């Protein structure tokens, strides 16, 4: 990776304290502790939530993200749009007005990154494209399920711990440890969805705070 590309990618996102970036506002649903026992009614409610989400594959969210690996890191706004297996993710730094757009398909795993100095980059592995361009490790093909806490156990997670409501609280998958720290309350048109998520894999960390969820009918 060229030094110029690394400088652009890391310099464009405002470097700030990660915890400050993803602090949960007051009044938002908070996460619960891992439960020793989950009632049958809670398991049924979670199964219904999962079924509803699988029946609604088109969705989007806006929020804030903080990414770090070793001593490199940055934070900014994130706008994720999902249309079945296809996604479009825009990362932007309001202060510098720079932005990057990653598009891809979770079925094929391929991706394309735009907004880099020197033009777009694309390849058969979106995660590798992002790693080579920015130095960041982000499991983009797992993220659509992770951000909704959907099919975690079915996706090959080595371990899943639940809270008393039957929702995933922590999970381990493909070397990553994912924590679901806060949830948005259910509304008239959608079930509970994660609000704050932290994922770690060695020195790689991703912290996400969702400000708004939209699920298409």
UniProtKB/Swiss-Prot annotation:
Q: Does the keyword Membrane apply?
A: yes
Report the membrane topology from the UniProt record.
Lipid-anchor
Q: Which GO terms describe its biological process?
A: lipoprotein localization to outer membrane; protein transport
Cite the CDD domains for this sequence. LolB (cd16326)
Q: Please indicate which superkingdom the organism of origin belongs to.
A: Bacteria
Q: Where does this one sit in the cell? A: Cell outer membrane
Lipid moiety (N-palmitoyl cysteine) attached at: 21
- What does the similarity note say? Belongs to the LolB family.
- Its name, as the record gives it, is Outer-membrane lipoprotein LolB
Gene source species: Xanthomonas euvesicatoria pv. vesicatoria (strain 85-10)
Classification of source organism: Bacteria, Pseudomonadati, Pseudomonadota, Gammaproteobacteria, Lysobacterales
């Amino acid at each position: 990776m060229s030094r110029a590309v690394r400088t652009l990618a890391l310099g464009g996102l405002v470097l700030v304290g990660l915890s400050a970036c993803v602090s949960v506002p007051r009044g938002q649903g908070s996460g619960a502790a891992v439960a020793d026992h989950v009632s049958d009614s809670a398991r049924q409610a979670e199964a219904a939530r999962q079924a509803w989400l699988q029946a609604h594959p088109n969705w989007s969210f806006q929020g804030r993200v903080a990414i770090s690996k070793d001593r490199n890191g940055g934070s900014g706004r994130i706008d994720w749009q999902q249309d079945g297996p296809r996604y479009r993710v825009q990362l932007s730094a309001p202060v510098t007005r720079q932005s990057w757009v990653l598009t891809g398909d979770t079925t094929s795993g391929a991706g394309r990154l735009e907004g880099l100095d020197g033009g777009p980059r694309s390849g058969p592995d979106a995660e590798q494209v992002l790693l080579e361009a920015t130095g960041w490790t982000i499991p983009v093909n797992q993220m659509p399920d992770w951000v909704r806490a959907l099919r975690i156990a079915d996706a090959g997670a080595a371990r899943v711990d639940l809270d008393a409501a039957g929702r995933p609280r922590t999970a381990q998958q493909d070397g990553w440890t994912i924590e679901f720290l806060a949830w948005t309350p259910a509304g008239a048109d959608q079930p509970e969805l994660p609000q704050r998520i932290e994922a770690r894999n060695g020195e790689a960390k991703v912290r996400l705070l969702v400000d708004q969820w939209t699920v298409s009918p």
